[in-house]
């Protein structure tokens, strides 16, 4: 999700936990899709698309309930509207079906002020503006878009004590303005720049204790994402057991998903 109104709509849907309904889907002759979801959720059968979308919405609702700190990134103020509603994804539909416009600062602020009074209330919110340029909007169009996002973030941070701004946009475009910090496309940040921004971000929002735990947390998360060449091997079962021991040594961290994965691997391959 790139534009603030689509981000706000997703957060409202998580808070309301209302299921996606068949009437909300579109059909392009091959796939059922939803203007609020990425194309990876589209499917040849409507029930299949609905199942994937509602599973994602349920997961988002659970994450929102559990979160005490939320990081939101505004990517662009340019939006496309279909039948008067802002869409998150155009799904390659004809351009004539959409109206393109730029969100105003007040429009963005109002949407998130309502969220702060509702589902985001009592949570710390960290806002960032994506430093990645949307060149499809032209350099001039990208500049006014980022300006609107930055002004909206500033006003929200001034209005709400639980809202803070992290300057990822300024770090990449001002602090790391040399092109050696950009990838080959000269738009996205290079790995060195990503690591630099991450160091600044973690120092700003994480406690010293949390930063000390990061290597251990990353080790376990990466291990759970690893797909072994021979999952049935005794070596991999022992690998999973060691990861479960490491998880047990960090009871303050929510590793439920990773622990379930390692336990399942041991059971299936025993």
Please give the residue ranges for each predicted region.
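Extracellular glycan-modifying ectodomains
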Residues: 1-270
């Amino acid at each position: 999700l790139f534009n603030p109104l689509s981000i706000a709509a997703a957060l409202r849907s998580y808070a309301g936990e209302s299921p996606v309904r068949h009437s909300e889907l579109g059909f392009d002759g091959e796939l059922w899709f939803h203007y609020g979801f990425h194309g990876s959720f589209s499917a040849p059968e409507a029930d299949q698309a609905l199942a994937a979308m509602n599973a994602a919405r349920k997961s988002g609702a659970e994450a929102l309930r559990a979160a005490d700190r939320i990081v939101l990134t505004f990517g662009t103020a340019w939006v496309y509207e279909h039948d008067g509603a802002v869409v998150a994804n155009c799904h390659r539909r004809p351009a004539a079906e959409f109206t393109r416009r730029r969100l105003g600062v007040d429009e963005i602020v109002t949407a998130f002020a309502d969220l702060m009074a509702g589902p985001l209330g009592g949570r710390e919110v960290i806002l960032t503006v994506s430093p990645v340029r949307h060149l499809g909007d032209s350099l001039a169009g990208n500049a006014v878009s980022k300006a609107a996002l930055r002004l909206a973030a500033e006003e929200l941070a001034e209005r709400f004590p639980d809202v803070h701004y992290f300057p990822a946009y300024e770090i990449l475009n001002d602090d790391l303005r040399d092109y050696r910090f950009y990838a080959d496309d000269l738009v996205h940040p290079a790995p060195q720049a990503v690591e630099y921004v991450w160091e600044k971000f973690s120092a700003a929002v994480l406690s010293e204790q949390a930063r000390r735990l990061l290597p251990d947390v990353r080790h376990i998360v990466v291990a759970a994402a690893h797909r072994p060449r021979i999952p049935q091997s005794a070596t991999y079962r022992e690998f999973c057991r060691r990861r479960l021991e490491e998880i047990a040594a960090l009871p303050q961290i929510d590793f439920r998903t990773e622990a379930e994965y390692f336990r399942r691997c041991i059971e299936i391959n025993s």
